[in-house]
Swiss-Prot record:
It comes from the Bacteria. This is NH(3)-dependent NAD(+) synthetase. HAMAP family: NadE_ammonia_dep. The keyword Ligase applies. One of its GO terms (cellular component) is cytoplasm. Deamido-NAD(+) binds at residues 110, 143, 150, 226-227. Pathway: Cofactor biosynthesis; NAD(+) biosynthesis; NAD(+) from deamido-NAD(+) (ammonia route): step 1/1. Mg(2+) binds at residues 35, 135. Keywords: ATP-binding, Ligase, Magnesium, Metal-binding, NAD, Nucleotide-binding. The keyword ATP-binding applies. GO terms for molecular function: ATP binding; glutaminase activity; metal ion binding; NAD+ synthase (glutamine-hydrolyzing) activity; NAD+ synthase activity. CDD domains: NAD_synthase (cd00553). InterPro entries: NAD/GMP_synthase, NAD_synthase, NH(3)-dep_NAD(+)_synth, Rossmann-like_a/b/a_fold. The lineage of its organism: Bacteria, Bacillati, Bacillota, Tissierellia, Tissierellales.
Amino acid sequence: MNYAKLCEDLTKWIKEEVESANLKGAVFGISGGIDSAVLACLCKKAFGDNALGLIMPIKSNPKDEEDARILAKSIGLRFTKVDLNESYDALIGTFEKNSVEMAASNIKPRLRMITLYYYAQNNGYMVLSGSNRSEFMTGYFTKYGDSGADLMPLLNLYKTDIFEMAKVLGVPDVIINKKPSAGLWEGQTDEDEFGFTYEELDDYLMNNSNTKSKDLIDKKIKQSEHKRKFAKSFEFDRRNY
């Protein structure tokens, strides 16, 4: 693929979509990871100073914030840090003590989504998500969290595409070379949770290749099907009532 042309076309598309909504820029999270880094680069090209990145730590690895700052400095991105630790602690404190770890972890991206929309409305911006196709198809996202956005520019691009785009866009090596992680807890990595690599996953999704992880991938796709659909509603014919 010609990733340089893809980045140009995607930048143009983002700008057109935001302007068609009569908005002037974009706000998005910068986590120190590669997806948000690629999104930040595209938005910076599209909007200049009207691209705003938010660093939103919640029990996060300090190295991730450091990497997010390195990215912002390298591309001249305007950014703000919003520390959500106290908000998270206050919310968790109102719940039962023996909560499921994942239920508590999923609060983090939902708090970030709320924060992004606050800044979007205050600035006349659109909320953009860095979710990619690999994560979307396996359900590796939080409903109404990192999937809560107005625009998902990377949703039809696989994780392996994101890595190639990062090289074209000049994302710092410290981000390109780190293991992808949702940062849900210390030491957590995407591929450890999956049980397979992004290369395996993307090859299977794109080419239906024969991989030893086929059954596991199919299971994740099936189990997460509900996450890719709008909430169902009761359908009825008024003439029957």
